[in-house]
């Protein structure tokens, strides 16, 4: 380690630099790998009895998406409970969580040497660094004192990042990369590092701690309910109820009672007083999924609640005050529903004070790989397998697929592949290859053809300026529709200043 003293000095200096947390973590792991000559290392956040990878070096890409319950991984549990450096003997019978996941050509090799560095702040565990090598003697020459220095630097780096995020949350200037305060136990973790997910996280953080109504839009299976849960958990109402109601599953005959409640004797079968969803969500949040399926009659009654903040149970003349925040979701384009007369314009404007668009999985790039790891670990636990590894060929296949069913489809595909692999082998170490995935390989050009602006091959009769204007106008119109007719979101998607976009749109006669 003496030869790389300058690198450790740089790690210390990084703590006060303007580096992003991601870059700081990656530099830390790179320095560890160079210093210890290990084959892989990982920085993990500890929260609610789970270790979540924040950065890795030398491991498969899907590891970042995995969440490791210490109850399922004896080595990680040993690190969490040790309070000091943990050196696992080369003949340890405890399975390593990274067996088969180290980026190495000889996949049959398993990890032979492993060190765990618990990261402690004021004697509280906040994370860990794991260091793995194939050579069983690789770490013998390094003293515990040297390893404790690494542990202290890593703990300070992670603690600084957590403090910065907390301060940004308090000031309302949350970073787009906010992802540390996450927990598999509360069901609101959103896996992803793509630009589309960063924008989604930024929008959630911007509006969560307000009282504004939110309209969540996006295709089926993209995770709109997850976004609603995140909005609630990050709000001042987080300690109160989040009440869910699927409007599409409501028969017309019981819909009003479900929303507003009824009194005894209000109708046949009303044998007692009953609260509706609005009362159940009083001082909390009501999530109305598939809001576009509500009848026009119920839309009118919902609008009244939003306007006056009170409800009437069926059969009761009294008004009951409620303090309920509304989050609605739909896979329909409600502006079109308004034009068609199927949705009230006044209710639409009340609900869409702050619209949030959830991107489809096909637009999220490498997030597919992270989600594959996340669902693979869930399948491993369900099947009681020792490990699940996805081959590089399978990862390529999954990334090339267009995912019309989005995240929900991906979860089912991974679960099915794991079951097939388990049925075909007696080995508890499962390997998922392309043959286990019942999806067709798609060409990148075919996958994206629907999103391209196609120009007919005809004789050119326009000058360059006219052709450029036409292209820009088409692109702006297309993006504007994709962003639910929101100019600010359109500007972000096109990476333009909002003012510049408005001026360009006026010049192209796209707006007055």
Curated annotation (Swiss-Prot):
Biological process annotations from GO: phosphorelay signal transduction system
Protein keywords: ATP-binding, DNA-binding, Nucleotide-binding, Transcription, Transcription regulation
DNA-binding region residue numbers: 487-506
Alphabetical list of CDD domains matching this protein: AAA (cd00009)
Keyword DNA repair appears in the UniProt entry: no
InterPro entries in alphabetical order: AAA+_ATPase, GAF, GAF-like_dom_sf, Homeodomain-like_sf, NorR, P-loop_NTPase, Sigma_54_int, Sigma_54_int_dom_ATP-bd_1
GO function term, MF aspect, one: DNA-binding transcription factor activity
Keyword Transcription among record annotations: yes
Short name of any one Pfam family annotated for the protein: Sigma54_activat
SUPFAM superfamilies: GAF domain-like (SSF55781), Homeodomain-like (SSF46689), P-loop containing nucleoside triphosphate hydrolases (SSF52540)
Pathway named in the protein's UniProt entry: Nitrogen metabolism; nitric oxide reduction
Annotated ranges, domain Sigma-54 factor interaction: 190-419
Binding annotation for ATP: 218-225, 281-290
Annotated function: Required for the expression of anaerobic nitric oxide (NO) reductase, acts as a transcriptional activator for at least the norVW operon. Activation also requires sigma-54.
Annotated protein name in UniProt: Anaerobic nitric oxide reductase transcription regulator NorR
């Amino acid at each position: 380690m003496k030869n790389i003293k300058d690198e450790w000095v740089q790690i210390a200096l990084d703590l006060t630099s303007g580096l992003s947390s991601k870059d700081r973590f990656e530099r830390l792991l790179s320095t560890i790998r160079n210093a210890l000559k290990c084959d892989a290392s990982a920085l993990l956040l500890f929260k609610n009895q789970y270790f979540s990878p924040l950065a890795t070096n030398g491991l498969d890409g899907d590891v970042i998406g995995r969440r490791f319950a210490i109850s399922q991984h004896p080595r990680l549990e040993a690190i969490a409970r040790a309070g000091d450096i943990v050196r696992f003997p080369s003949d340890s019978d405890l399975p390593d969580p990274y067996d088969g996941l180290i980026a190495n050509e000889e996949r049959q090799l398993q990890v032979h040497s492993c060190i765990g560095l618990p990261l402690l702040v004021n004697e509280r565990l906040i994370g860990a660094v794991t260091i793995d090598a194939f050579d069983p003697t690789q770490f013998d020459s390094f003293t515990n004192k040297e390893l404790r220095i690494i542990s202290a630097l890593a703990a300070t780096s992670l603690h600084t990042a957590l403090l910065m995020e907390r301060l940004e949350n308090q000031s309302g200037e949350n970073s787009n990369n906010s992802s540390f305060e996450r927990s598999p136990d509360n069901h609101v973790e959103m896996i992803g590092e793509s630009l589309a997910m960063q924008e989604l996280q930024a929008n959630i953080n911007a509006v969560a701690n307000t009282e504004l109504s939110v309209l969540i839009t996006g295709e089926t299976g993209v995770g709109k309910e997850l976004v609603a849960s995140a909005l609630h958990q990050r709000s001042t109402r987080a300690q109160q109820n989040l009440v869910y109601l699927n409007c599409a599953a409501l028969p017309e005959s019981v819909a009003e009672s479900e929303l507003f409640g009824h009194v005894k004797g209000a109708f046949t079968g009303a044998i007692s007083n009953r609260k509706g969803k609005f009362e159940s969500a009083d001082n909390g949040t009501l999530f109305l999924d598939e809001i576009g399926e509500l009848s026009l009659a119920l839309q009118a009654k919902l609008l009244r609640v939003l306007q006056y903040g009170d409800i009437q149970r069926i059969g009761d003349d009294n008004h009951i005050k409620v303090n309920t925040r509304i989050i609605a979701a739909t896979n329909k384009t409600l502006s079109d529903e308004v034009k068609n007369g199927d949705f009230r314009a006044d209710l639409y404007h009340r609900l869409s004070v702050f619209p949030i668009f959830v991107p489809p999985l096909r637009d999220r790039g490498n997030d597919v790989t992270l989600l594959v790891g996340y669902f693979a670990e869930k399948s491993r636990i369900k099947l009681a397998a020792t490990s699940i590894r996805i081959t590089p060929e399978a990862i390529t296949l999954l990334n090339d697929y267009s995912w019309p069913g989005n995240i929900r489809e991906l979860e089912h595909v991974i679960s099915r592949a794991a079951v097939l692999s388990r049925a075909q082998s007696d080995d508890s170490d499962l390997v998922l290859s392309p043959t286990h995935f019942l999806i067709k390989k798609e060409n990148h050009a075919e996958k994206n053809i629907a999103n391209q602006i196609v120009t007919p091959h005809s004789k050119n009769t326009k000058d360059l300026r006219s052709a450029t204007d036409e292209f820009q106008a088409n692109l702006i119109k297309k993006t504007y529709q994709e962003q639910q007719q929101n100019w600010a979101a359109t500007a972000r998607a096109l990476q333009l200043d909002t003012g510049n976009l408005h001026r360009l749109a006026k010049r192209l006669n796209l707006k007055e």
